[in-house]
Amino acid sequence: MKLHELQPAPGSRKKAVRVGRGIGSGNGKTSGRGQKGQNARSGGGVRLGFEGGQTPLFRRLPKRGFTNINRKEYAVVNLEKLNRFEDGTEVTPELLLETGVISKLKSGVKILGKGQIEKKLTVKAHKFSASAKEAIEAAGGKTEVI
């Protein structure tokens, strides 16, 4: 195969439809837009969600809930991810960020209890689930709430 022999996959390239170029083309005169009306005009068409004057769905449905401005979102780390550290390491949010375990600090770090932990670690985080705290201490490690 040579560069000049390369061809696009069959059916992957479509020829542009040239509208308004005579009635014999099948897309002449009104260019496939039908007769008069909003959609035949330039810039014509209805806005997103418009239902012809009928009250649109988003206004028929009731409002619900609110956004809590005080919401805190924690970066979640499961126990199984902590096994990558050496025995006796002090695991801090900064270390987790450095090693790529978490991508952003957000409002802090929360350690959850999914998986097993085989290393003896000192873990410093903003929150711990009960099962995570139990598992870290059972492995001989320490937990510290920042």
Swiss-Prot record:
Q: Give the domain of life.
A: Bacteria
The annotated region (Disordered) lies at: 1-51
Function of this protein?
Binds to the 23S rRNA.
Family to which this protein belongs: Belongs to the universal ribosomal protein uL15 family.
Assembly state and interactors?
Answer: Part of the 50S ribosomal subunit.
Q: Which GO terms describe its molecular function?
A: rRNA binding; structural constituent of ribosome
Q: Name one GO cellular component term.
A: cytosolic large ribosomal subunit
| Biological process annotations from GO | translation
SUPFAM superfamilies attached to this UniProt entry: Ribosomal proteins L15p and L18e
Record's keyword terms, sorted: Ribonucleoprotein, Ribosomal protein, RNA-binding, rRNA-binding
Protein name from the UniProt record:
Large ribosomal subunit protein uL15
Instruction: Tell me what organism the protein belongs to.
Output: Geobacillus stearothermophilus (Bacillus stearothermophilus)
Q: Where is the composition biased (Gly residues)?
A: 21-35, 42-51
Kindly give the HAMAP family that the UniProt entry links to this protein.
Ribosomal_uL15
